[in-house]
Amino acid sequence: MRKPKFETPDLTSENIEKIAALFPNCITEMLDEERSTPEKRVYKRAVNFELLKQMLSPDVVDGDEAYEFTWVGKKAAIVEANKPIRKTLRPCMAESKDWDNTENLYIEGDNLEVLKLLQESYLGKVKMIYIDPPYNTGNDFIYADDFRMESEEWKVESGEWSEDGDRLFKNTDTNGRFHSDWCSMIYSRLMLARNLLTDDGVIFISIDDNEQENLKKMCSEVFGEDNFIAQVVWERAFAPINLKKHFSESHDYILCCAKNLNAAVCNGLPRNAEANDRYNNPDNDPRGPWTSGDLSVGPRVESKVYEIISPSGRTILPPSGYCWRLDQKTFEKYKMENRIWFGESGDNVPRIKRFLADVKQGITPMTIWKYSDVGHSQDATKRLKDLFDGKAYFDYPKPVALIMRALLLYSSKDSIILDFFSGSATTAHAVMQVNAEDGGHRKFIMVQLPEPCDEASEAYKAGYKNICEIGKERIRRAGEKILKEQLANNNSTLNSPNSKLDIGFRVLKLDSTNMKDVYYAPCDYDQDFLHQLESNIKDDRTDLDLLFGCLIEWGLPLSLPYKSEQIDGCTVHTYNDGDLIACFDANVPESVVKEIAQRKPLRAVFRDSGFESSPEKINMFEIFKLYMPEDAGDITKRVRVI
């Protein structure tokens, strides 16, 4: 019987298997020091890296130097990204909004661990990621990752502590590993984030001058240099700070990379009246409004230098050093098709007609985003204060319009949008706003560490103990505001049967595994003690905790509908019309097993204590074999006991 592990995949082992498939001669064995004992030596598969390097090189490898970007702790960051964890996401209905109907998620917890838990459920499903990570200004909040060096120097350094006793490190410029710590923190998260993107997906990352250079190099490594799209300059300020000694910085950067540049599609910016006003139709051309472009171009190419006779009889040559854009044969064709314009008098220098109907609907974006178009920092702060009755509960939020522009450029109406440094939840606000304006059904996933608010802050005094509480309340208030505005405007997109605006969200919180420690280390207990254990599951875990733990284990989305019902005295949960059916009751009667099996779910799960004996478990599997389709395959992969 195959039991679920309830831990994220061991990516290191998976990567070794992939290498073995390509280069079997590069796989060897080495002593597994963690699992070996004095009585028994245990070996594990490993990669012969020297041989692998030679296999990938056309020349003899002899320690040649190569261009690379590295820092102290880079290898540890890679190990940290691949390391499995024993954690889960526990639902919190009390803090959610419209739990039963929403497809949005708000996840509280360290984003590195959350990204690991999302690897199976959202692999290749996220169309766009926007993140606004710490800028590493010397006082920014850095996550308590395992790659940090262990020494007395780091242990005594000032910092804050999480509720679990983990130090939440503030990266100061006196730290000898100032840039290294920041690079390690971001690198491991980018590695995991890339896996979640669709093939045509993109990521936007806000950053300032402190780490812009390093971030761009890391993105080139993680996403590939060929998948770089643009580095946008956002004009975040409109007035100088006179106290600055040299320059007053007025901009930040937004790095944009694709998972696969060849697959990514830019929608362009919406065309406005100003853009369309450049087109008119003075000659009543049946093809509609048009504008004209210069027919001459440089440098001069002799084959494209020829005389043009205007309708008025004037002979026209291109200017000195220039030639015509079209060769003579193509020009004559365009002239016959009425695509050449000599002016109303017929005596002007010829120009090429460009019709509005032929222009792509989206305007190609430029790399400078002005505050007049996407907002500035002060405007973002003001608008957030307006949501909270004039109170400033969050410093330096990003403008909603800024993220809306990114959404318009690279998301479609049914995309999943991820922000794993969600802060004040501006991205969630932007997703709801864009959906309200274009009738879309974009879904958001917000991830945020519950960083405690300063007890002297206005937010703490108002009852917000951590940033997550501010973010969730911001989504609630923004959603209600957007819905109210749309209803007041009688917006047609809200009146169609299938376009109900989703302003809800399911709250999930990162926690330890649902299983007791004995589940992972049975060798630590003798047989008599094992028999005394009634359940492998922790006492404080509910059916909903177990259900969502199974969703993560099986790689199912966490936002789909489910229902619970009573069958012969047992509670049965059906997720997304049969993707998974679960019963976590004790002593499950055969009638319930038969009823579940007859529904032919794709997956089914029971609690170990649901069966009093091994024969009962075997009988359960036999019942499923009886009712499952013949092509169902190995039943133990579809039916599990936890």
Task: Go through each PLM region and give its residues.
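Phosphate/ATP-binding catalytic cores across multiple sugar-kinase/actin-like superfamilies
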Residues: 111-114, 118-121, 185-190, 196-199, ...
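Conserved Class I SAM-dependent methyltransferase catalytic core
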Residues: 170-229, 465-487, 513
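Active-site-adjacent helix-turn-beta-strand microarchitecture at beta-sheet edges
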Residues: 259-385, 389
